[in-house]
Amino acid sequence: LKTGMIVAERYEILGKIGTGGMADVYKAKDHKLNRFVAVKVLKPEFREDTTFIKKFRSEAQAAAVLTHPNIVNVFDVGDDNGVYYIVMELIEGITLKEYISKKGKLSVKEATSIAIQVSMGLEAAHSHGIVHRDVKPQNIIISMDGKVKVTDFGIARAASSNTISSN
């Protein structure tokens, strides 16, 4: 996607803020609600796999029911002429991976605080029957004010095969 593009007649792409194996993440302006959001867009090489697309959408919809201070909120999911996207809360901060790279070894107090916040987010997801399955430093965001949030619930389950449910 290019800066200035409008997705779903609503989200104006402002620039790329991250990339992963299956999707790119952009900062965008939601013109309907007048706020900044993160828009995760499925990479083109995955757009032809209908099974993957179904899982991507259903898991994103499942993650959207999660509302917790330690989970990145999902606001919307859809596709715009073959551009499959998930709209999420925009967290101004860095991933735990970036944080560790910059800071080096964490203190016991800091590591414990991060672990507790991640655990609280995962517990909230588990109470809704949602399993993350891809918890790693890249999927943990530390906001500018120190709040820790887990992200990538939808894509994590959609990306692995035969994972729709473990009831």
Briefly describe each language-model feature range.
Residues 13-20, 25:
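Protein kinase glycine-rich loop
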Residues 29-36:
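Conserved N-lobe loop of protein kinases adjacent to the ATP-binding glycine-rich P-loop
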Residues 43-65:
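AlphaC helix of the eukaryotic protein kinase fold
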Residues 50, 144-167:
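Activation segment of protein kinases
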Residues 77:
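Activation-segment/catalytic-loop signature of the eukaryotic protein kinase fold
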Residues 118-130:
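Protein kinase catalytic-loop region centered on the HRD/HxD motif
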